[in-house]
Amino acid sequence: MLEDFDTLKSDFFLYARRRGADFDEFPLGIKPDNLGGRHLEIKADGRFAVVGTDRGIETERRETYSKSALFNWLIELYA
């Protein structure tokens, strides 16, 4: 099942708030910036990937099927 990005963001804000992390906006977009930043990929099989790219080259990738694992990564990386 393909997760709706808006639903994922809403779930993240609730999850982060319960863990004492306050976010004004979702920390990742869904398109690569190719400038050393990260983006989120949501795969059709339900997998989430946090991917870093720099000048078109993938430099980092973390994948999971778990929303809570994804949310923990985002809090760890951006809080």
Where on the chain are the PLM-derived regions?
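N-terminal "first-domain core" detector
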Residues: 1-39
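Conserved aromatic
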Residues: 2, 61-64
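Non-transmembrane, interaction-prone segments in cytosolic or luminal domains
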Residues: 20, 48-50, 73
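Generic alpha-helix signal with a bias toward terminal, lower-confidence helices
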Residues: 24, 28, 60-62, 76
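Short aromatic-glycine-(Arg/Gly/Cys) micro-motifs in beta-strand/loop hairpins
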Residues: 30-59
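Amphipathic protein-protein interaction modules
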Residues: 64-79
